[in-house]
Amino acid sequence: MRIQALSLFLVFCLCGVQAQVKTSQIPTWVTPTEYSQSPAIDKNELSQGTLQLLRDNQTHLVKETVYIRQVTQVIDNAAIQEAGTINVDYDPTFQELVFHEINILRNSSSIDKLQPNNFQLLRREANAENYLYDGSMTAMVNLSDVRPGDIIDYSYSIKGFNPIHKGLFSNSYTFDGYSPVGKINVRLLSNKPLKYKGFNGLEKPFLNKINGLNEYTWTSTDVTPLTYEEYDPAWNINYKLLLVSAYDSWASVVNWAVNVYQENQPLSDDLSSHIEQIASATEDEGERIQKVLDFVQEDIRYLGLEEGIGGYQPFSPNQVYEQRFGDCKDKSLLMASMLKQLDIEAYPMLVNTTLKQSILDFLPSPIFFDHCVVKVIDNSGKVYYYDPTISSQGGSYAKTHFPDYRYGLVIKRGVREFDQISSRSENKVEVKDEYRLDSIGKGAILKVKSVYHDAKADQMRQYFKSQSLNAINKEYEKYYANYFYNIKSIEHPQLTDDVLANRLQVIEKYKIDSIWQPMEDKKNLIEVQFVPNSIDGLLFIPNVEHRKNPVSLDYPSHHIHDITVHLPAAWDIQSEIESVEHDSFDYQYRATYIPFVNQLKLHFEIKSKKDHITVEKFSDYSRKVNDLSNKLGYVIYTTSDGSSLTEFETGNGTLKIVGLIAVAALIIMILVVRSNQSARNDAYRRRGGFY
């Protein structure tokens, strides 16, 4: 088993073997592509010390062969390490790699560097840490004597298409990048007409007939780098993109998928027995859906064998049940099969986890999906969607969180269009901070009660399962240290989990030795800052009023942060209320002082209404969110001896700096509890398939 040789922490298996790769002349069907060694590009845009002069991709569909040529100039010494190493990935189960040329052009001479014996073959498992094993091989060669100014020109072919597609070709090509490119060339030869679609001003192809084949050629020269903006939504296709497909409709993709997901054998005795146990132990349909979902999510561990056709074709439900592991398509087919056996209508469904509504603009093809989930229809006709790869989910069958994938293609014969999916989750987070201040200039006790709902509860539940309580306690302390000097946890976080309601509560308690700090630029004054850290950093705070791309927002999302401060003396504080309404979010702020108990109450609330801000609405958003960012906090201050208790301040410069520090800490926390889905997306972009 290849899994046994893998470490989950290695990108490459280190036991590379010396091997002789196959070599041949450049195929006769390939058209030589000319390029300029001095393209009209801005060299100040170059990164990593190299200039890509040519990116050439030619595909012969009848011969099932892809020819690749890369020409790169080394600009300075810093790039020699990377430019002098050539890596080519391929799947040995259905592909064959053949190198044609490796030349170094130096001072008008060409140096032949193609030495087949110098190659190493490495078993590449780039996603092993995410429990995905694709069986890819990497042919690697390190070139000797590479110098600044050299032009490295190499070409190779990969023979063989994935047989799962039954000869139906589809692919995508980008004509933009992080750095300038002298020339990009894409050429296709096909014996059948191809559908193609360009985005963002990509020019139409040059069409020709050659030896009875249809020839399609796209060429871009002096390609400028794409300008990237923060918080650009993943679904926003703002680059030059070419899609090519032989599929004539989404219905034909469904028909392909129905055959790939065909169950060709009856359920095994063991699996049938398990299903019968569920039927006997439950009384209604909802309970049965819940039992099957729990079993597939928790008892079938996430692990994918994606070698060859395995990137698209699921294992049989019997095998997945027996081996107790599978990826998204394995889990989805097993879940749908179990529900059907219980007389509940269910189907696997293909989604793209990042494209969302943009998938509607794509040409029909299965390669544009990266994930598989399940659609369930109960006896009353009500529709539910489930992601069987998510673990530690709470909620009843009717309220289980389903991610905002937006559109899905159900694998059911006769389906011709996408299901539109709306999230039922609010994903509310409620935080209550209670500060009990000692005498002025001294410390305080902080008690924090956080309540998480829906997907936020799922994430925190998984976070607490995957970390020790001691480690969590240290991370929490480190997080609050961004706000308060010398803060120590009094006790470990206390967790209360109502799984059925999907409501998870965490209580923390801290001692702050020095909550009062000197005010900047104000002698003899000390202050305490109160920041709603669960909200701070949720909204992108731009420093411009205009941009070219939409802004991505966390959606659906509802955050409430209440702060109660028990003051050591009476304070001169005025109550105030403020709200901000925008097309994409609502914000509320309220400050109340209760004089007879010397208590200050603060309320902060943000609710997202959309998953993005449009370019047209951005200017208004920028003004409002920048004004709002100066009000995400509260300050009380007095003289260092406490002789003069002064009114509050909001949004001063010092507080804003604290907020910026908090953003970094908040991002760390978000990364800790995030799901593995983004890792699956990376795998999709590299190879294709459903994970």
Per-range role (PLM):
Residues 8, 37-39, 679:
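Compositionally biased regions
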Residues 1-6:
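Bacterial N-terminal signal peptides that target proteins for export
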Residues 679-691:
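Cytoplasmic C-terminal tails of single-pass
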Residues 14-15, 47, 686-687:
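Intrinsically disordered, low-complexity segments enriched in small/polar residues
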Residues 670-679:
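Cytosolic-side junction of a single-pass transmembrane alpha-helix
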Residues 7-15:
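Bacterial N-terminal signal peptides
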Residues 20-670:
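A sensor for short, sequence-defined functional sites
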